[in-house]
Amino acid sequence: MSRVASPFHGKRVLLLQGPVGPFFSNLAHDLRHAGAEVFKVNFNAGDWLFYPRDTHAFKGSLQEWHDELPKLLHRQRIDAVLLFGDCRPIHARVRALAERLGIAVGVFEEGYLRPDYVTFEPVGVNGHSVFHQELAEWLKQQAALGAPQAAHTDRAGQSCAPGEAPSAPAGSNLSEHQAVGNCYWNGARWGMLYFFASWAGYLFWNNALHHRPLTIWDGLWWLLSFARKAYFRWTEKGVQQKLEGELRQRFFLIPLQVHNDAQITVHSEYESVCGFIDHVMRSFAGALLRENQPEKQLPLNAESVQGDVLVFKHHPMDRGHRNYAKAVRLLTRRHGLQGRVLYIHDQHLPSLLKACKGVVLVNSTTGLSALGHGAPVKVCGSALYDVPGITYQGRLNDFWFEARSALPCAQMLQRFKAALVTRTQLNGSFYRKLPGVAWRCGVRLQGQMAQRLWPEPAMVAMPGILPKVAASQSLAPLASSGPSEACTGKGSAL
């Protein structure tokens, strides 16, 4: 695809805060190569470290930023704003302001389908996602198809339809994606450099603008995280084997989320992670009591929970910042669950998802991983994937009894993932470049950014779902038109 052919050609693009590391700097190079004029605002020395040239340094207060933003958009005649995380204080007003001014907004976020994807959506992500708003229409399309009763997902995460081999849906990118590999240490390296630079430059910038503390203490918490990782590896030796052996199919896995993640603070009704832990324990204790009372009616497909336990898994990125051991012990005693609760840290998550009886979470993207491994999932908050046929739709109080009969439908899950990838995901990582891709940012773009920011009104087919409908009205995967020049490394389609 030539530069002139790119929808970004002639566009004026504003980059606000991006992920830690050089991703936004490299993306700016790709945008310029496509013919766009790029403007960048830095808010702290960490931003400056990875994007030092041709930028605007903002060092005022949050209120001053709110006053400056509309002036900046007007002064530079901005056509599109790109940012990472739509709930950060400096980004929170961008969506409404841009909508009023007719400016496109593209939001990056960690991938819904990790580790091989990052998220890029117009308008917003998670609870602000357009995909989330259009799920009702998608569900109508699935109802028109009829629920595939013969197919379900077994505990190995494979389709169990007679004679049917599991495969990615036609027209999706699932079968064509490139594996990213483990990029934990890449992200950790960029993160440490970012926070150290931000702390070192605190005299020259207003670090209070950042959504997390940028102090020397925060750096110490990251050092504490590495120390705790080694400590828990020693103290929790043997836990993985116990869960995969003695307790296999007898434990419910509860993945905890980062304490100040917007998924908790903005997109859930829980005041804190501790509030969620309390809710889960109270419900499970009630289920144990309910089973022992004959007058209490149990669900139709109820199975005993008397031999089951709860396993709370700490989020690895929150290891140095929070420790819920004391709260877990207190709540365990309060709800009479002694001997039925484990609090763990760094076990191999995919193996746990395969071995557990079910998964309970607020709205973490771990839920999609769990579904992929065939685990029944109960969502206690608001999540994109919390739809009938994929997750358990009943009450948490009943999930404990009905988990084994709440396996996700394989065909439904495949259709959903195909739509999710096509509409919201980009193959790659913010922290580690995919080898061999044509874009300096290291993510496989293939024209998808422009398509999502400025969707064409053309009619597109929905493979395996329904006849043709308007592109803006369908969540079904777009029909593949074969590899473009960008796919082969000859172009720069964004």
Language model feature labels by segment:
Residues 20-26, 43-137, 159, 367:
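Active-site and donor-binding regions of nucleotide-sugar-utilizing enzymes
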Residues 1-44:
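N-terminal subdomain of nucleotide-sugar transferases
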